[in-house]
Amino acid sequence: VGSEMCIRDRLDSLAAKFETEDFIKDDPIQFLHRFNDKGKEDAELAGFIASLFAYGNRKMFISKLNDLFARADNDIANYVKNGDFANLKGMEYRFAKDYDIIPVFEILNKLYSSSKGLEELFSYAFKSENFLQTVVDYFYSNAPKTAEHGFYHMIPNPANGGAMKRMNMYLRWMVRSSEVDLGIWKFMQPKDLLIPLDVHVARVSRSMGLLNRKSNDFKAVLELTEKLREFCPEDPVKYDFAMFAFGVELNKEKLGV
């Protein structure tokens, strides 16, 4: 128990140190803050779209997102609702080509035409038996028959057992309220969130003895989130910042910085 207390204290201090406004400028959450002044729909759409591209090299995907939002005249809610996505032709990032990206926008257009949009979809799904699967199934049921790997990489299927890192990160942005996270969705509480698990968070968690599972999959997400709930039941995902910070510090030690 003593060593667990030490770990918790270390995580708490790292989380407090890194979860500050200064974190925003180099993180994809910058797009939610940029669009939040325009309104809730703009922030939730900017966040959802940013989360789809948030993998690989951070500088690269942030630059790609700047390009994408510029094509949308930095008016993302109106752009989605207007439904003319011709100027996304030629847009691509790693696995996603324009013929993968445009269908996502077309589905979002349909969602906002027929409902209150992403908040309504996610809140409806949250009440269902299988939260993330219900969200994803909406996109799959409206996907073109020609949808290819790039589309399914942007919106992965939870049934495959993956960590669903980007969707859990999006939920962190939208549900937690802090200097960094917006907290504009109220249908769920921070205690309901799951840790966004990537290779860095997984490596740090294992090195601290918080995660035993060897695969970085959904079962690992549940195991680690349960452990973090022991430290902070009402807000386990705040430790995402601590894990990130710890990973950065470990790298510095390796590099001798």
Residue map of PLM features:
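Charged interaction scaffolds used for protein-protein
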Residues: R8-K252, V257
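Short, small-residue-biased leader/transition segments that mark boundaries at the very start
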Residues: V1-C6
